[in-house]
Design a protein with these regions (language model features):
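Sec-dependent N-terminal signal peptides
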Residues: 5-14
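Glycine/tyrosine- and acidic-biased, solvent-exposed loop/turn segments at the edges of beta-strands
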Residues: 15-300
Length: 300
């Protein structure tokens, strides 16, 4: 129905207004209606504009009874097409395409009565896809995909009413998975997992409304555990244990709402104690230190 309407508009314009052309500088816009300057009658016909530098046409569109109706075209000053839209009663309606100056496509999609509607695809200037997804009344819905300029997938997931809802997965530009998890109303929720560029797991735990709320485990790139501890509302809480890259415990202690409390113990390799510090709400109360043979030394 929409395409037939546009065809009828174009035919009407061609028959009735092919001889009625005007430079846009001779038009006035009053309450979004085009008039010939010093005229009270809405203009109908073809409006155009030329580049002051090259004298090449850079704009042309059709007007019926003062409103944009039909094809709306733009060109770069080098003569290459910049965009092509369709209008219906001053609103973008129907298929559109925009281009980079090098002639490659920039965007392609649809408008419906002034709002993005349906599948829309975006490209980088090198011709690689940039992102693609479906709009409903200008808001993203369903599966959306994003790419790096090198053509590798960057992220992919679901939107509802324009915001992230559902499963999303992210990748490094080399094609290796970076992270995955779920969103609810644009906030991270539930289990999230992160990876290093070598494919080994980096960290894992649960989110609640974008805040870490669970036991979280972090790993070194060589797969050895790095640290384990609890988060409550994105703040460390309870006992935390830290390990070296070879798997030995090197530090442990307690947090309360993100502040160090109680006893914190440091170890040399081989489980020999190195330092012991007492904290109260993040403030050091006392400390003891040992050398590598177990003798008490001054803490510097």
């Amino acid at each position: 129905m929409g395409s037939r309407f546009l065809i009828l508009i174009f035919a009407f314009i061609s028959l009735c207004y092919s001889q009625n052309e005007i430079n846009i500088k001779n038009l006035a816009i009053i309450e979004n209606i085009y008039f010939v300057k010093d005229s009270k009658k809405p203009f109908s016909g073809s409006a155009f504009s030329f580049s002051k530098l090259t004298r090449e046409k850079i704009l042309e569109f059709q007007i019926i009874d003062g409103k944009k109706n039909g094809i709306y075209s733009e060109w770069y000053i080098n003569g290459k097409k910049k965009s092509k839209y369709n209008y219906q009663n001053n609103l973008k309606h129907g298929r559109y395409t925009t281009y980079y100056q090098n002639g490659k496509k920039k965007e392609k999609g649809f408008w419906k009565h002034g709002k993005n509607e349906g599948l829309c695809t975006y490209w980088f200037e090198n011709g690689q896809r940039k992102k693609e997804g479906i709009y409903k009344s200008t808001k993203g819905v369903g599966l959306w995909s994003y790419w790096y300029p090198n053509g590798n997938i960057e992220r992919e997931g679901y939107r509802n009413n324009g915001i992230k809802n559902g499963f999303w997965v992210y990748f490094y530009d080399i094609g290796v998975k970076k992270s995955k998890g779920n969103y609810f109303d644009d906030f991270k929720y539930g289990l999230w997992t992160f990876w290093y560029t070598n494919g080994n797991k980096q960290s894992e735990g649960y989110y609640k409304k974008d805040k870490k709320n669970s036991l979280w485990t972090n790993w070194y790139a060589n797969k050895q555990k790095r640290e384990v501890g609890l988060y409550i509302d994105n703040k460390e809480d309870g006992e935390w244990i830290y390990m070296s890259e070879n798997g030995e415990k090197i530090l442990s202690g307690y947090f309360n709402k993100g502040k160090k409390v109680k006893t914190w113990s440091h170890w040399y390799s081989g489980s020999r104690k190195k330092k012991q510090i007492e904290y109260n709400e993040g403030i050091i109360i006392s400390e003891l230190c040992w050398d590598k043979i177990g003798e008490i030394i001054s803490c510097l």
